[in-house]
Amino acid sequence: MSIVNSVRAQIPPIHREGYPFVGGFALVTLILFWIWSPLGWIGTVLTIWCAYFFRNPARTTPVRDGLVVSPADGRVSMVVDIIPPPELGLGAKPLPRVSIFMSVFNCHVNRSPVAGRIERIVYSPGKFINAELDKASEDNERNSMVLSTEHGQIGVIQIAGLIARRIVSFVREGQPLVAGERFGLIRFGSRLDVYLPEGTKPLVAEGQTAIAGETILADLKGGDAGRIYRTD
């Protein structure tokens, strides 16, 4: 029994958004096995990949006041100062922005970068160009959220990409979130932008690998006081 529990501990659960996809792949796989077994094995591989894509692992989040953690797994594709999109309502001055690109191999469950209350959620229809391009932040379909914290407002934008055609949000305006709490998901490759308060110095660099709920993007308080961690 201990061996079984050990194996289970190493396999993350599937997010509920993935149930229809994994179930569909599994059904097709059974049909393929009935038609011709080699096709069934191909279907098995695709079913396992689909389950892997929708994995929903626990993460250990540092929850000290002022820390901003990554909202997504992926690669830090841009760290720039840029004027935020108007739908965020964060003004017309350039703000620090950290962009994280998620490939189809990354976990796509998105987590709140800070503890705060959701002031605004705005959905914007748009195109589906390559999410790595800078103009994707303005041209692509996206879901924008503003979080109010003791240290200012944080903007978080889920951006669809070439393959990602479905942005899912689990939250509503006025809802409080804790750092690292799951708030959404984007299917099959995309990007997350985080807008930080003016004067904030990002602690990550372009090309760095980020882990949702764990990698620290910035420290709004400065310094490096002791941290407390929460696993979820």
Swiss-Prot record:
Site (Cleavage (non-hydrolytic)) residue list: 189-190
Catalytic activity of the protein: a 1,2-diacyl-sn-glycero-3-phospho-L-serine + H(+) = a 1,2-diacyl-sn-glycero-3-phosphoethanolamine + CO2
Active-site annotation: 190 (schiff-base intermediate with substrate)
Pathway: Phospholipid metabolism; phosphatidylethanolamine biosynthesis; phosphatidylethanolamine from CDP-diacylglycerol: step 2/2
Post-translational modification: Is synthesized initially as an inactive proenzyme. Formation of the active enzyme involves a self-maturation process in which the active site pyruvoyl group is generated from an internal serine residue via an autocatalytic post-translational modification. Two non-identical subunits are generated from the proenzyme in this reaction, and the pyruvate is formed at the N-terminus of the alpha chain, which is derived from the carboxyl end of the proenzyme.
GO molecular function: phosphatidylserine decarboxylase activity
Record keywords, A-Z: Cell membrane, Decarboxylase, Lipid biosynthesis, Lipid metabolism, Lyase, Membrane, Phospholipid biosynthesis, Phospholipid metabolism, Pyruvate, Zymogen
Cofactor(s) the record lists: pyruvate
Record's keyword annotation contains Thylakoid: no
One of the GO biological process terms: phosphatidylethanolamine biosynthetic process
Main location per the UniProt record: membrane
Modified residues (Pyruvic acid (Ser)): 190
Membrane topology: Peripheral membrane protein
Enzyme class, spelled out: lyase
Cofactor note: Binds 1 pyruvoyl group covalently per subunit.
GO cellular component, one term: plasma membrane
Presence of the UniProt keyword Translocase in the record: no
Localization terms from the record: Cell membrane
Function of the protein: Catalyzes the formation of phosphatidylethanolamine (PtdEtn) from phosphatidylserine (PtdSer).
Family: Belongs to the phosphatidylserine decarboxylase family. PSD-A subfamily.
Subunit structure: Heterodimer of a large membrane-associated beta subunit and a small pyruvoyl-containing alpha subunit.
Protein name: Phosphatidylserine decarboxylase proenzyme
Encoding gene per record: psd
